[in-house]
């Protein structure tokens, strides 16, 4: 394959580097859900640097296989799009990460109202709160019928899950 061979000579390195460049997108797509996220991201970044250097050499350098570089560029762009789509929910959950508190009762102006576990639970978003039995702990005072959580540290919203 022309570009790497002209860069590395006609030796073994050029041949294996070509096969590496062609096989890594397939390997990344196959191992996307097997490997950990960090391994996936590091492999994709390493591959992107190798591919960027390769395409730069093909387009700017003295190689003749420009069409080959554009095929690799298209494969790389598909890989990047797939990686972005795959990472967006994770990034969103990292930035919006809050622990969930599940309560079995709601305090209303007329008194605490129990919520059967079989039908509905009130899930409260808050930082570091926990539920023990029917009591909310870690600074949570009460959940009102309006669905607002009042605590010493912050206020969060209670959601009913059907």
Curated annotation (Swiss-Prot):
Alphabetical list of InterPro entries matching this protein: Arteri_GP5 (IPR001332)
One Pfam assignment: Arteri_Gl
UniProt topological domain (Virion surface) ranges: 1-10, 62-67
Protein localization: Virion membrane; Host membrane
GO cellular component, one term: membrane
Topology feature Intravirion, residues: 32-40, 89-162
Keyword Disulfide bond in annotation: yes
Keywords annotated in UniProt: Disulfide bond, Host membrane, Membrane, Transmembrane, Transmembrane helix, Viral envelope protein, Virion
Transmembrane domains' residue ranges: 11-31, 41-61, 68-88
Membrane-topology annotation of the record: Multi-pass membrane protein
Function: Major envelope protein.
Family: Belongs to the arteriviridae membrane protein family.
Oligomeric form and interacting partners: Heterodimer with glycoprotein 5; disulfide-linked. This heterodimerization is required for transport to the Golgi complex.
Protein name (record): Membrane protein
Organism of this sequence: Equine arteritis virus (strain Bucyrus)
């Amino acid at each position: 394959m022309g570009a790497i061979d002209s860069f590395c000579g006609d030796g073994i390195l050029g041949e294996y580097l070509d096969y590496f460049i062609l096989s890594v997108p397939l390997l990344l797509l196959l191992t996307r859900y097997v490997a950990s996220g960090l391994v996936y991201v590091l492999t994709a970044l390493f591959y992107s640097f190798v591919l960027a250097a390769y395409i730069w050499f093909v387009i700017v350098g003295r190689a003749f296989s420009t069409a080959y570089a554009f095929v690799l560029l298209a494969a790389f762009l598909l890989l990047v799009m797939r990686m972005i789509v795959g990472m967006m929910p994770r990034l969103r959950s990292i930035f919006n990460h809050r622990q969930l508190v599940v309560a079995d009762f709601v305090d209303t102006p007329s008194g605490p109202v129990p919520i059967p576990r079989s039908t509905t639970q009130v899930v409260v978003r808050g930082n570091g709160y926990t539920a023990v039995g029917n009591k909310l702990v870690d600074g949570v005072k009460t959940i009102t019928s309006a669905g607002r959580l009042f605590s010493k540290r912050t206020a969060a919203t209670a959601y009913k899950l059907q």
